């Protein structure tokens, strides 16, 4: 694809051996202090604040990184990520692929980089000569701030600044050419990052392709379904409980007293644990109409994806048997993106559910990334 001398070091490796942790165990403990709350002063976005070596794929050098980004109110905050690069010097600047995880919980200890390098297709992308960055997203990983679940502006900024941080680490060999990929909530972050990259927020970056996989796009439609569903209440609860710092909304307007009484669980449990806490029909936890009227409705509309032009073409992939994020949502999303003037391709996969999309779409996704990152314009 791009850097053949890097590819040889990864020949024959299995695909996707480093994948997202999905457990019921409590969030990871920060044993080294790397993720301790950190005050961040003036400085450029994406500035590297600290690094720490960590285990990762064979043939790659892998680090945890703390870097500077902005929250939705333009306040500087510290975010964390994992980054892996082929070991050894790069003959030419390496392209960067940012992989954005789906829902994991909202506590700092849920940050994927705390437990390892976590990116689908990571082995293959490294073998193709790419640098792979896996941002935790603001509030996940580093202590001291709240992760506003599905808040597009916050997530999009953290993704773009993770790419900037990769380029600042000279040992990675990372250049400006970038692709963005992510699953579910991570797909929402990718869409936002691509849209931000088309503005001054993307200065210095060359984004070539965005690949949202089974993404969340229209937050109003998504939350309306989840708030009147059996078994998915943890998702609107996470959103309603974490947006007060980034939007003019009040959690109690959307959450029932029963939900408000259990919000401490958000600080101690991963997603699967939260799904157990907030089990049963969502109306036990979400006020009827609470997320679809008034200030909450306006906030969800503001943070929905696909409303603004993107810097790069978009490849949407979605499983037709997905009952978590419906394929019809993404069909509509493709139409919405098209109205912005952004090039968009939609590919759907029969008999494929929310998680199976990774394997079903891998050939299409990897081939598309190869073409985009290998295009010299």
What are these regions (language model features)?
Residues 1-89:
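Catalytic-loop region of hydrolases
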Residues 310, 315-322:
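Short beta-strand/loop motif that positions the catalytic acidic residue
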Residues 71-129, 142-143:
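Short, surface-exposed "cap/lid" segments of acyl-processing enzymes
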Residues 149-170:
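Alpha/beta-hydrolase active-site loop
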Residues 14-16, 22-24, 213-306:
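Accessory cap/linker subdomain of secreted extracellular hydrolases
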Residues 99-102, 134, 316:
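Structural cue for short, hydrophobic secondary-structure segments
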Residues 288-298, 324-377:
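C-terminal catalytic histidine-bearing segment of alpha/beta-hydrolase fold enzymes
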Residues 164-235:
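Primarily recognizes the serine-hydrolase "nucleophile elbow" in alpha/beta-hydrolase
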């Amino acid at each position: 694809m791009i850097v053949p001398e890097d590819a040889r070091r990864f020949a024959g490796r299995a695909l996707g051996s480093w994948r997202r942790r999905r457990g019921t165990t409590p969030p990871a403990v920060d044993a080294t202090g790397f993720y301790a709350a950190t005050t961040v002063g003036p400085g450029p976005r994406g500035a590297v604040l600290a690094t720490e070596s960590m285990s990762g794929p064979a043939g790659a050098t892998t680090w945890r990184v703390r870097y500077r980004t902005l929250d939705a109110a333009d306040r500087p905050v510290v975010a964390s990520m994992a980054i892996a690069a082929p070991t050894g010097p790069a003959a030419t600047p390496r392209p960067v692929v940012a992989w954005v995880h789906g829902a994991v919980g909202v506590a700092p200890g849920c940050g994927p980089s705390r437990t390892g390098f976590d990116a689908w297709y990571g082995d293959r992308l490294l073998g193709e000569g790419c640098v792979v960055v896996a941002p935790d997203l603001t509030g996940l990983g580093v202590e001291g701030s709240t992760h506003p679940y599905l808040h597009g502006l916050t997530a999009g900024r953290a993704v773009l600044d993770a790419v900037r941080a990769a380029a600042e680490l000279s040992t990675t060999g990372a250049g400006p050419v970038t692709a963005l990929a992510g699953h579910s909530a991570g797909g929402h972050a990718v869409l936002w990052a691509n849209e931000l990259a088309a503005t001054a927020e993307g200065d210095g970056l060359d984004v070539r392709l965005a690949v949202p996989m089974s993404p969340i796009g229209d937050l109003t439609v998504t939350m309306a379904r989840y708030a009147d569903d059996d078994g998915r209440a943890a998702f609107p609860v996470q959103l309603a409980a974490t947006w007060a710092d980034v939007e003019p909304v009040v959690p109690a307007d959307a959450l029932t007293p029963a939900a408000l009484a259990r919000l401490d669980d958000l600080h101690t449990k991963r997603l699967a644990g939260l799904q157990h806490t907030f089990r049963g029909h969502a109306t036990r936890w979400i006020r009827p109409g609470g997320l679809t009227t008034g200030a909450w409705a306006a906030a969800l509309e503001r943070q929905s994806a696909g409303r603004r032009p993107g810097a790069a073409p978009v490849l949407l992939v979605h499983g037709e048997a997905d009952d978590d994020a419906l394929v019809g949502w993404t069909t509509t999303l493709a139409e919405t993106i098209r109205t912005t003037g952004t090039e968009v391709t939609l590919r759907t996969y029969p008999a494929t559910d929310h998680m199976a999309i990774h394997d079903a779409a891998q050939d299409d996704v990897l081939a598309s990334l190869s073409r985009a990152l290998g295009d010299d314009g």
